[in-house]
Swiss-Prot record:
It comes from the Bacteria. It is an enzyme of class 5 (isomerase). It holds the Pfam family PRAI. CDD domains: PRAI. Pathway: Amino-acid biosynthesis; L-tryptophan biosynthesis; L-tryptophan from chorismate: step 3/5. It comes from Oceanobacillus iheyensis (strain DSM 14371 / CIP 107618 / JCM 11309 / KCTC 3954 / HTE831). The gene is trpF. GO terms for biological process: L-tryptophan biosynthetic process. This is N-(5'-phosphoribosyl)anthranilate isomerase. Its EC number is 5.3.1.24. Coiled coil: none annotated. It catalyses: N-(5-phospho-beta-D-ribosyl)anthranilate = 1-(2-carboxyphenylamino)-1-deoxy-D-ribulose 5-phosphate.
Length: 204
């Protein structure tokens, strides 16, 4: 099971993510309190080992902007949280994580997606998509056809991650606010989160 730590905005935090042996690191390019510039993402990316995959998070971004950022930051994966069309997705040259809300409609759309990974997140709060620290009923994900490529997100933290994994058994988990203290990434929480994910007693 892999772990993605999202919303990285500094070299120090990126190093904490690397030290904790996360599998993926997420840069948010969409409007958000965790949004960072392409220049800063490029600077951080240049410090990372090849063992960690760099994920760029976008919401209905013009395709040419994504293609430019992929090249500048050397992204490994693109994560899409908007209403991007199938044709749009086909023009992205690297693997895609397609995010869907944990709703009946969202799950129906997820089942039709050909993206490499399906990320299921809590339904958006007002205009915010992702990173809101709110959980949802994980039981709705049991026995979904896309479980083998499912990334679970939405309100995960060091306290609930073991129960989440036992319930859903996803391919990966994605956390942002759940490893923060006072709105800032907390190295100890990052390490504890990953330790809890890796504990053998969480697996079915």
């Amino acid at each position: 099971m892999f772990v993605k730590i999202c919303g990285i905005t500094s070299i120090d935090t990126a190093q904490a993510v690397v030290d904790a042996n996360a599998d993926m690191i997420g840069f948010v390019f969409a409007p958000s309190k965790r949004q960072l510039s392409t220049s800063l993402a490029e600077e951080i990316a240049n410090t990372l080992p090849q063992t960690i995959q760099k994920v760029g998070v976008f919401v209905d971004e013009p395709l040419e902007n994504i293609l430019s950022i992929i090249e500048r930051v050397n992204l490994d994966i693109v994560q899409l949280h908007g209403d991007e069309s199938i044709d749009y997705q086909k023009r992205i040259p690297i693997p895609i994580i397609k995010a869907f809300p944990a709703t009946t409609e969202g799950l129906n759309q997820a089942n039709q997606s050909s993206a490499k990974y399906i990320l299921i997140d809590s339904p958006p709060l007002q205009s915010s998509r992702g990173g809101n620290g709110v959980t949802f009923n994980w039981n709705i994900l049991k026995d979904q056809p896309f479980t083998s490529k499912l990334i679970l997100a939405g309100g995960l933290n060091t306290e609930n991650i073991r129960e989440a994994i036992k319930t859903v058994n996803p391919a990966g988990v994605d956390v942002s606010s759940g490893v923060e203290t006072n709105g800032k990434k907390d190295a100890k929480k990052i390490q504890q989160f990953i330790t809890n994910v890796q504990r053998k007693d969480v697996l079915r």
